[in-house]
């Protein structure tokens, strides 16, 4: 019997966006380089290599997020223990909404995500570094 998916990704993202702050791209660009903010790039490493990256953003692959946030886990990254605002982004703003929701539910705060993701960032003229491939 085929699987019956009861909740699609669009509904999940919509629900996440009701729980978290969504920052417009122009506002997010102003946060770059601030001492009180960490921009968290959750894209896959291949996306960074292909499309480039935001200078100074911390790269945390989406698949490792929960493990890197948990201070009791062996994969914990100290950046997630800092008293800062964590602003997540992906390529288009869908995965980052889910990531910010998960981070918030784990107790990380404050968190937000960038509307439009890296694509919106580039379109708005935000600073970028080229990919390596």
Describe the residue ranges of each PLM region:
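Short, surface-exposed ligand- or partner-binding patches at beta-edge/loop junctions that are enriched
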Residues: 89
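Active-site flanking residues adjacent to catalytic metal/cofactor-binding acidic residues
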Residues: 40
